[in-house]
Amino acid sequence: MIKALTNDAVSLLKDMVAIPSLSFNEDQVCSFICKWMDEKGLAFRRVGNNIIARLSEQAGIDPKAFEGKPTLMLCAHIDTVSPSNEYSFDPYNPDYAKAAEVIGSEDIVPGLGSNDDGASVVSMLATFIYLTSSSGAGFKNNPSQASLGPSPCGQGGSTVFKPSSTAAVNADIILVLSCEEERSGVNGMTGLWHEIKDEIDFAIIGEPTLMKAATAERGLLVIDATAHGVSGHAARNEGVNAIEIALKDITTLTSHEFDRISPRMGKVNLNVTQINAGTAHNVIPDKCTFVIDIRPTEQYTNEEILAQLQSICKSELKARNLSNRSSATVTDSPLQKTAEALGIETFSSPTTSDWMRIDCDAIKMGPGDSSRSHKKDEFVYIHEIENGIRTYIDFINNIL
């Protein structure tokens, strides 16, 4: 059954890649996925350009099987970043022979969004379909146990998958396919969470992690800094040089040590990444702007970091967004215990995701590799999708 699910997932992913779905422009791809789900007989609801489906609400599923049990959210995003200008093939309609030559493998789905985050989208959809099928865990007729077959060599996970009986299902499942993730839009998980949060106990955020489980991810705090001086003529040494103020502040900021150290992520990371000043060679600049990129840990709120940095420098600091917080899995949570029991490698992720927009316990885990994201010639291996489906099913069937 896994091979059939994988084939369906790959076909869907190729169709999704062909539909441009930049953040804030997901309507077409959302409509396509809704049509696909409708053809598969799945019950779902569309909220803007987000899609929500619940296992206990599917045809043939006995909702009583989930009474008193927690709910696990599977979440992946359907939007993409803009394509790089350096693609070796068309990012939406790739020549597969050319892409295979560039990448060095025919076992691929190439194109924008294939890896981030289409692979997680289709793998989670395939997992959801499996759970709603007569081979799945919550079917009313309680079918006989059915093996999913062996896992591919070297792909990890269990070698045999056997669905549980209805009585053995440990959690209801809510599948959420979100929009606007790449640009932190208010109509994606940011707004949707307020509607669904009371239904959800814990979550798996689908992002390309090689199916390792991120039990922590750094946040993101971008600060625009402005040093104010007084303009004057350079020949007469007039004025107050804003560049000199900025340089002193930059030295202070980059040498600053945050006291609280995360046991999972280590120190807060801070880098100055842009600087701009001056209008002419003979004018002392009265303004110098620079940008600070900060990757917080769970030890500090973004507000705390901003206040601490403002207290040690003269430049005016303004945060672009204070909501991109860091996240960490609850110690000894069901998610952590299940990952450990299944031998799934855990790590701390340097990148952000929809995890920062929810406030329940979560891990981040999905097929593909983050190192391929937001770059030219994006792709995902087909065997990664197959392994993603297997691992998601295994995780759900064994959640502790």
Language-model features, listed with the residues they occupy:
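Acidic/His- and Gly-rich active-site-bordering loop/insert found
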Residues: 1-114, 147-148, 163
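Metal-dependent amide/peptide-bond hydrolase catalytic core
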Residues: 4, 153-156, 208, 213-215, ...
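Secretory-pathway/membrane protein signature
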Residues: 10-11, 15, 39, 68, ...
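Buried hydrophobic packing segments
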Residues: 33, 121-131, 192, 246-249, ...
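Intrinsic disorder/low-complexity segments
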Residues: 58-68, 133-170
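Hydrophobic/aromatic beta-strand patches that form the interior of the parallel beta-sheet core
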Residues: 72-74, 176, 202-204, 363-365
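Short glycine-rich anion-binding loops that position phosphate/pyrophosphate groups of nucleotides
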Residues: 77-81, 181, 369-370
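Acidic/histidine-rich catalytic neighborhood of metal-dependent amide-processing enzymes
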Residues: 108, 118-142, 161, 165-217, ...
